[in-house]
Every structure is written in C-alpha cells, then in structure tokens.
Amino acid sequence: MGSAGSKKQSKQQPGLRERLLRARRGPRGESSGERQERSLQYPGGSDKGLNSPSCDGQKTLGAEGGGKQDSDEDDEDNEVGVRVRPGVPLRPMTFKLAVDMSHFLKEKGELEGIFYSERRHKILDTYLENEEGIVSGWQNYTHGPGVRYPKFFGWLWKLVPINMIAEPEDEETHCLVHPAQTSAWDDPHEETLVWQFDSLLAYDYVAFSRFPEEFGYQSGMPEKEWKAKLRARGIPTE
C-alpha cells in the first residue's frame, strides 16, 4: 500500500487548457469575460468538456488556505501544475516541431478561443518546456494593432482582437483579474486578444512579409530604415 505522499505524486497533472483557465481567477462569481470565453471555445454557450472557470473555485481555495486569495501566486509552477524541471531533454523549437505542436494543441482543443495574457503566455511557454522539452523564448507575436501574427515560422496560432461585453458597474469587483478583463491591460493597444488557429501560417510567413521591420537586422533592411519604420509605428527600437 502506497503512502499518502506517493498517492499525491501519482495524481494526474492537469492539461494545458485547465492550467490556462486556472490562471488569475477572481474572488467571486462568473464575469462576463469568462462567459464570453466559454462561448468562444464552445459555440452556443455549451459547457461541454469544460469545467466552468468560475471564480468560485478561487474562493474555495482561499478558504482552504486560511483566507488567502491567490495563495499560489508565490509559486507559479505549482499554480499551473507543471513540473519544476523538464521531464524530457531540452531542444530548440524548429519549423517542423512548431507545426506539429500547433496541430497537437488544436486537436486537443487546448488554445482555441482562450483569452491571451502575459501570464498565460508564460504558462504556455512553461508547459511546452517542461512537458515537451521545447526551450522557451521562441513565442513572439507582431506588435499590432489588429491581428498579431506569430514571428516564429511554423507556429500556427495567431492572436485575434475581439470586442468585449461591457461589465455592469455594480459588478466591477467581479473577477477583475480574469484575463478577459486584464488582457487589454497587457496590450499596448488596449485590445483584448484570443488565440486562434490558422493552418495557412504553415505556408505564408505573414509576420515577416507584412512587418519585416519587426525582425530588425534579420529583415535584411538597412538599420536606419527598419528603425525608422518601428518609430513611425510607435515601437521602441532599443
């Protein structure tokens, strides 16, 4: 008979989607952002295959943790349920690997319609590094505004801006830390973004063809030219 510790260690790790949905839940109730996130993931408002990312879960966690909200904020690895260290040998991201992982996440329904935030960006990086051995640092998108295209050729997930349903004033304390509310805070153009799969990105390097200046010296443009274009778009050059 195994000990309680061994049973805890053998507990199945949550999937990427669950980890993303657990990020930054608020103190109570379900916000309009969470409802919209569910409707984006499951057309028709169905809850099929998804436990609601309701803030009630965070309220329960707070009660069990001595009333401390976001108690796992101090240990982000524990919050997202990934290993502290990679379970497989590390390897760099490649075009083929990016395409394969993009389709893998698409087939598992892990990213489609999920609100983007800097925190969720980090969770995705950490998940792929610890579960697949893919060294982080490759996941970057064009500056915007509008659709943000992946700058790594082969990654088939772009960020698409959506219009958010306004939250009633008397609910302003509900789930203010949910990515539906905070996504625009992270974004320099104050747009709320969601991940969207686009298989055509495997054939068309949109980020490079439309915004070569964002690639700096790799663009093949004279330094003065690409820096001037960045400044004209309000993008820092240093």
Curated annotation (Swiss-Prot):
The keyword Nucleotide-binding does not apply. One of its GO terms (cellular component) is membrane. Its main location: host cell. A motif (PxxP) lies at residues 86-89. GO terms for molecular function: GTP binding. It is found in: Host cell membrane. Residues 70-77 are annotated as: Acidic. It is a lipid-anchor. Residues 16-38 have a biased composition (Basic and acidic residues). InterPro entries: HIV-1_Nef_core_sf, HIV_Nef. The N-terminal domain is composed of the N-myristoyl glycine and of a cluster of positively charged amino acids. It is required for inner plasma membrane targeting of Nef and virion incorporation, and thereby for infectivity. This isolate is from a Gambian case of 'neuro-AIDS'. Homodimer. Interacts with host CD247/TCRZ; this interaction induces down-regulation of cell surface TCR/CD3 complexes. This is Protein Nef. It comes from Human immunodeficiency virus type 2 subtype B (isolate EHO) (HIV-2).
